[in-house]
Amino acid sequence: MAAVTVRERILVRAPSPGEGIQIAGLWRELWDAHERWGGYPGTRDERVYARLANRLDEDARVRGGQPVLGRHIHLVAAIHGQVCGQVEGWFERHGAEARTPYTCEVRSLIVHPRARVLGAGKALLTNLARMSHELARGAPSVLAAEVLEPNPAHGFYERLGYRPVAWSSRMVVSHEPRVRAGEFVARPAEPQDALALAVLESMLAARRRAAHDERFDRPRAIDATLVGAIAAHLGRRHRDASEPHELVTVDARGDVRAAASLVISPLDPPFARTRRTILGRFAIDPAREPLPVLAPLIALACRFAIAAEAPTMELTDLTLPGTPLYDATLSLGAHPWSRIVTRLA
């Protein structure tokens, strides 16, 4: 499944041993750009990039000229033998149903400015789509990329047919939103919440379909098997904070009115040492306005993040800007962060 494509003077192929230093340099350019756009900072330790270059060389030797290794795809663009761009893809299915498309997550796309006018970025994504299509073996597959809001590449993705399907905001967790006492309370989900969570999950799935987000399962019929599986999951003791924790907002009667999943995990080098917090999969009772039920949910998540020494929290799986869900997060102290753009492979 070797990728060899010539577009003008651009050659797209798998990385070769000895190119680790060039690829690590590209990654450093990318992390520096993300930091300028407000993203997570990269390390300034040169030894980290030297180790990264060695790991990339070893990875290239294992690949033996093939872009695909397991579920990971790695492609570089070269001009006259010099690497001028690279992209990674992570191939998986976000769901249990056979009809749910595979997703190839676009990661770390970076191209030297001098190679952009030659179409290196487009060539990399075109080949990544082809790899994804081959891995899917005839099943549908979707390419998905997260693009930070300050990133000037929005127009580039749009020209290639990518369309936004979900949005994110981000907040400083020390700015925990104030919550009105007595109306709604947030807490970790418990097994007895399983039926309510199954209903909310179905609403989330329907919302994703309405946004043309093909990455996830369609709404499922709510039956005893589904509710039992959710209850069993909620009753299981979590081993660490990197596993999703379900949080819920309940009203004065104890009825669940909103839910979300919290994940806190360390960022690996070459990022600077820190923790990343994501609160996503927001599902809200449509009979309720988002703001009052979100406030205690986000406040509780902020407290978990502070305890884990994570400075910020991303709020993902949001509807488009200008809608009540998205705007509620801004009212609670978040700012625009990123969007997910997708296209069929």
Predicted regions and their residues:
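Conserved GNAT-fold acetyl-CoA-binding loop/helix
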Residues: 31-61, 208-234
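A short beta-loop-alpha structural element at the N-terminal edge
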Residues: 11-25, 31-38, 185-212
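Conserved acyl-CoA
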Residues: 112-114, 123-142, 293-311
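Conserved beta-strand-loop-alpha-helix junction that forms the acyl-donor binding cleft
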Residues: 113-116, 127-128, 132, 142-153, ...
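Conserved acetyl-CoA binding element of GNAT-fold acetyltransferases
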Residues: 90, 99-113, 271-288
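Conserved beta-strand in the GNAT
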Residues: 72-76, 82-91, 105, 110, ...
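Conserved glycine-rich acetyl-CoA-binding loop
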Residues: 108, 112-123, 149-154, 159, ...
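Conserved active-site alpha-helix within GNAT-family acetyltransferase domains
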Residues: 122, 134, 148-166, 319-337
